A protein has these predicted regions:
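Solvent-exposed alpha-helices and their adjacent loops that cap or buttress functional pockets
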Residues: 3-5, 26-27, 82-84, 105, ...
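Active-site segments that bind and position negatively charged phosphate/pyrophosphate groups
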Residues: 191-297
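Structural motif
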Residues: 31-33, 87-90, 111-113, 149-151, ...
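Short glycine/serine/threonine-rich phosphate/pyrophosphate-binding segments
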Residues: 18, 41-45, 96-103, 122-125
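A short, small-residue-rich loop immediately preceding and capping a beta-strand
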Residues: 81-104, 108-119
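ATP/NTP phosphate-donor binding region
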Residues: 1-87
Length: 297
C-alpha cells in the first residue's frame, strides 16, 4: 500500500477574476505585499488597487523582485520590512518573478498567491521554482510540497501583453507532451501519478494545435477570445498540473528531457538569456528531441 499526498492547483480564470481576491485571500490575513517585475507591476497595479479597495485585503507595498530568479534575491527580499509585515505575498509578473516569490514564500513560511501578467509558462501553479545564478545561468530546480494558494489568471490583462510571450509559452507547453511521452516510453509500471501526468500531457499539445494560431492572432490584436483563453489554460494550468504529477517525487525524470536540457545548457551563454525567451529555446529543443527520437514527420 502506497502512502503519499498530491497537492493540485487552485485557480480562477476570466476577465474579472481580481474581484475574487477578498473572498479567496482574506482567510489568510489582511496585509499583502506585491512582488514582481517593474513592467508587470505597472500593468497590474491599478487593477489590484481597484480590486482591493474597501475590502478586507490591504496592499501595503509594491516591491521589485530583483530582476533574476536567484537565491540572493530571495534572501534580500526576506529582509524587506514590507515583506516581514505582510500576511501573504502577491507574486506578479512572468516566470522568474513568480518563481522568486514562490521560493521566498517557502523560505519565510508565508502564503503566496500568483498573478501572471504574461502567458509564457506554468509557474503560476507549480510546486517548483527554477533558480539561476545572479548572472542568469541555470542553477537548479527548487521543489516544495504545495503550489501557490491560488492563481488569478486575468485574461483581459494577459491579452494585452506582447504576443511573443504567448508564442514562447506554446513552445514550453507542447514540450511537456513530447518530453514526458519519450521519457516514459516502455515503462509499464509507472505509479498512478506519473501515468496520470503523462496522460494529461496530451492536453499540452492538442489545444495548442487546435487554438494556438487563432490565439496568437487575437493576442496581437489584443482580443480576449475563447481561443486565447483555451491556449492560456494549456500553458498555465494543464502544463502545471502535469508538472506537479510528473515531479511528485521531486525528480525530473518524466517532467523534462532533451528540450529543456538544451535550454538550461544554453543559459551559460549570456546572449541566449538576454535575447531569447525560455519557451522559445525549449521549442527549438523539441525539434532536436524529435530528430534524436527519429520522429521526422
Amino acid at each position: 500500500m502506497e502512502n503519499y499526498s498530491i497537492n493540485l492547483p487552485s485557480y480562477s480564470i476570466g476577465d474579472n477574476v481580481y474581484e475574487k481576491i477578498e473572498k479567496i485571500c482574506s482567510p489568510y490575513g489582511s496585509k499583502a505585499v506585491v512582488i514582481g517585475g517593474h513592467k508587470a507591476i505597472n500593468s497590474a497595479k491599478e487593477l489590484l488597487i481597484s480590486a482591493t479597495k474597501d475590502t478586507k485585503v490591504s496592499i501595503i507595498d509594491f516591491v521589485w523582485y530583483g530582476g533574476e530568479s536567484c537565491f540572493e534575491n530571495v534572501d534580500e527580499l526576506a529582509e524587506n520590512e514590507s515583506v516581514k509585515k505582510a500576511d501573504y505575498l502577491f507574486a506578479v509578473g512572468g516566470g522568474k518573478a513568480l518563481d522568486t516569490t514562490k521560493c521566498l514564500a517557502v523560505k519565510i513560511n508565508k502564503p503566496v498567491f500568483t498573478f501572471p501578467t504574461i502567458a509564457s509558462n506554468c509557474s503560476p501553479v507549480t510546486c517548483v521554482s527554477i533558480m539561476y545564478t545572479k548572472e542568469g545561468v541555470f542553477k537548479q530546480p527548487f521543489f516544495f510540497e504545495k503550489p501557490p494558494k491560488h492563481a488569478f489568471i486575468n485574461t483581459s490583462l494577459l491579452c494585452k501583453s506582447p504576443s511573443k510571450y504567448l508564442w514562447a509559452g506554446m513552445g514550453d507547453t507542447y514540450a511537456k507532451y513530447f518530453e514526458s511521452s519519450v521519457s516514459s516510453r516502455g515503462e509499464d509500471t509507472l505509479v498512478h501519478y506519473h501515468r496520470l501526468g503523462v496522460v494529461i500531457s496530451q492536453m499540452c499539445l492538442e489545444p495548442i494545435l487546435k487554438y494556438g494560431k487563432k490565439a496568437l492572432e487575437d493576442n496581437k490584436n489584443k482580443v480576449n477570445s475563447y481561443e486565447f483563453e483555451q491556449t492560456v489554460l494549456s500553458i498555465a494550468i494543464t502544463t502545471g498540473i502535469a508538472s506537479i504529477l510528473l515531479t511528485a517525487e521531486h525528480i525530473i525524470d518524466y517532467n523534462t528531457g532533451l528540450a529543456h536540457g538544451i535550454f538550461y545548457g544554453l543559459t551559460s551563454f549570456p546572449h541566449i538569456e538576454e535575447n531569447h525567451i525560455h519557451g522559445e529555446v525549449v521549442g527549438f529543443g523539441v525539434l532536436i528531441l524529435l530528430l534524436v527520437d527519429k520522429q521526422y514527420d
